[in-house]
Amino acid sequence: MTVLSQIIKPDDMIKITSEFARLGDRCYLDNAGATLYPKSLITSINEDLLKNVYMNPHTDKNTKDYIEQIRCLILKHFNTDPSTYTLIFTSGTTQALKLVIESFQFMKNEDDDLNCGSFVYLEDNHTSVVGLRELAVDKDAEVVHIAHEDFLNVINTKAKQTSKYTNGGNCLVAYPAQSNFNGFKYPLNCIENIKNGCLNNHLKKHLCEINSDWYVLLDAAAYVATSKLDLAKVQPDFVSLSFYKIFGFPTGLGALLVKKSSENVLSQKRYFGGGTVDALLSNEHYHIKREIFHERFEDGSLSFLSIISLKQCLDTMYRIIPRIIHDDIMETISYHTFYLAKDLYCQLLDLRHRNGTKAIKFYLDSDFSDITKQGGVLTFNLVREDGTYIGFSEFQHMADLFNISVRTGCFCNSGSCQRHLHMSNKDMKDMYNAGHRCGDEVDLINEKPTGAIRISFGYYNTFEDVDKFVNMICRCFVNAKARKQKRIINHFVETPKIKHYNGNVNKIINEQIYFKNVDDVLINIPPMSTKIILKEICIFPIKSCGAFKILSGWNIGPKGFEYDREWMIVKDNGVCLTQKQNTRMCMIRPQIDLKQKVMILNFPGKTPISIPLENSINEVQKNGSLCHSKVCTDMIKGIDCGDEVADWISEALEVSFLRLIRQSSNDNRSLKKKKDEDKKLLSLSNQAQYLLINKATVKWLSEKIKDPLFTDDLNHLTDRFRGNLIIEMEQELLEREWHSVIIGNHEFKVEGQCPRCQMVCIDQQTGEKTVEPLRTIAEQFGGKLRFGIYLSYVGTVNKSDDRTLKTYSPIKAILNDDNISR
């Protein structure tokens, strides 16, 4: 039984969640990545901009004065004022950090090279902090990195400068107020110890023997999103932050807060932009910096409209968040998010498979017993019944299927990731050499995770969000009978100042789902024994829409089958729409009529519409418009097919302002190859010209699926994999061993296995989402979401000009050991 404190009253939570009705059934659990903006905030910003005229502050005094007022309001939010701190607007946390290191004076005297100060950073910092070391090296500063445990031990030790030498350099230490990796809160009450030299013993020997002046750079970006930074109680020299982390808006705007008594050490800023000088000669090396400190650092025109929106951001947050804890909205948010994360932690802590194996491996530095040490963040990985890890990419696909937004990977915190995953420096380098890159989907190497799953809560999250997430975990990943659980919600009783209200009891009853035991993820591939035929040809004229099934034969073009994925639907922002965002797309079923030379679009309940196939490029460019979009990071040149079909598609998919785009004939998108290999042209398909599906493997998979709710027959299940070439043979899985394929008179090269995502969980007849077959694919292939093989066209075997591939053609498969199977 989990006993928790409910912070925000149910009625208040209803008002808060109504601000985010646009989420629909999406469960957003990535507040550490970005806070969501409330609806009324955007409305109020819009109204403010429509009724006022804001000009460049270099031109308009009223705008400049308003910005100064907002500067004061932001400082007040952190319980300080302009007499103690100066606020410098930046483009974000990263620029704020960079501004400090670029301007920091490590040597007290420019001629004293021997006593240059040091740059000290915690190994578990965000990448943006670690990157500062490169600039510190350029300034001849000693660079020192400190491990997590060492840092905590040292900074909690009281120190006092005792050396008789007082001419040491200036030292800068950078650490986060809260880890963006797992939400651990680093001590803020130790700043005085740092300034008194508790880190001296980590410097070079000759620097240990002299007194250095220490300055603290606090990365507060993750902390201020859900916690109260009280600069009246703790006073770091420099604080960096981004406003979208707090308010959800605006992006591209941050701040550097500089303690007034530490301004003098930021004296080495070299570049100066518009608005930062009092006098300048362009024909002589002469300029005078602004007298007002923050004006020296805000190069060029400020992002004044974004800054002005901060007034509405503050007003909105103070309006919609009740002041439950210490009469403070940020304290309220802190407690609210902490108890949500603690609830999730408690539920996952006891989650086990049927054989007793723990299903969760946590990566924490606290146990959620102390809110001063932990934020509303939980980081972990999933473990299978046999003790092996489930890759975060596999998890991500399932989360997407359930409309749950989370963050996976290392979260730009290599140090924390390395420490918690127990990876050596050699391990990290070996992973890179094996092909793993930051931000990619390579989640397991040698069965070891390369990253983790991070859940983070905002003030708009509820216990229902926790339930939805836990139910997804139980349904998809835990081989166990879900237990009935009770959660007791108590009213919060920390201090007499807090407003009390009656609690209630909510019962969480998780679904009981039958799960198959995974005995062995090693797949036995049977030997080839019988013939193979091409059973069916399918093309998908419009990317991510329904299939056009061909009964006889079809022409092979330079990019794949003719008319296969030659069109795509784009949103009003130019981004390609797929079934992941709109499952109704599968019910748009194109037909290619070669006699009439048209493509006919069909959709249930709508009159079909046709568009011509053979308009010349000149005609299309005359009547349509040339446009650009992206498919799998590739820029695509396309032709807009006009308003009539655009309106038809928009009505069918119930999304406004959609457009149908046809790939331009002179678009040269190609298959990613090594430099010395011939590049094959690609249509709008994701990764290859053709996708082959073996029906025997589909049948094998169907027999492995044990979910009683999944009722697809063999043909419907095959349709989910959206293959171009559907083959029939007796053996399952053998296609995974092929090197190349000869179908009739045409040779194809195997380009690898097809990676799968939640698209296969969309019923191609109805657009409904299911958990299967992705879950079983992951189970059977050890977490590797691969099904089907990619092919590229080589040419005809007899060197003829024949370009027609016919159904029921015989197939010869060449195995990886060069044996030919028939």
UniProtKB/Swiss-Prot annotation:
Disruption phenotype: Silk moth larvae are transluscent due to the absence of XDH activity and are thereby unable to synthesize uric acid.
Catalytic residues of the enzyme: C412
Gene3D superfamilies given in the database record: Aspartate Aminotransferase, domain 1, Type I PLP-dependent aspartate aminotransferase-like (Major domain)
Domain MOSC: 658-814
Keywords: Molybdenum cofactor biosynthesis, Pyridoxal phosphate, Transferase
Cofactor(s) required, per the database record: pyridoxal 5'-phosphate
EC number(s) stated in the UniProt entry for this protein: 2.8.1.9
Molecular-function GO term, any one: molybdenum cofactor sulfurtransferase activity
Residue pairs linked by disulfide bridges in the UniProt entry: none
InterPro entries: Aminotrans_V_dom (IPR000192), MoCF_Sase_C (IPR005302), MoCo_sulfurase (IPR028886), MOCOS_middle (IPR005303), PyrdxlP-dep_Trfase (IPR015424), PyrdxlP-dep_Trfase_major (IPR015421), PyrdxlP-dep_Trfase_small (IPR015422)
Reactions the enzyme catalyzes: Mo-molybdopterin + L-cysteine + AH2 = thio-Mo-molybdopterin + L-alanine + A + H2O
Residues recorded as bearing N6-(pyridoxal phosphate)lysine in the entry: K245
Keyword Transferase recorded: yes
Broadest EC class assigned to this enzyme: transferase
Annotated GO biological process: Mo-molybdopterin cofactor biosynthetic process; molybdopterin cofactor metabolic process
Function: Sulfurates the molybdenum cofactor. Sulfation of molybdenum is essential for xanthine dehydrogenase (XDH) and aldehyde oxidase (ADO) enzymes in which molybdenum cofactor is liganded by 1 oxygen and 1 sulfur atom in active form.
Family as reported in the entry's similarity comment: Belongs to the class-V pyridoxal-phosphate-dependent aminotransferase family. MOCOS subfamily.
Matches recorded under HAMAP family: MOCOS
Leftover remarks: Was named 'Organdy' because of the color of the translucid skin.
Name of the protein this chain belongs to: Molybdenum cofactor sulfurase
Species in which this protein is naturally found: Bombyx mori
Gene: mal
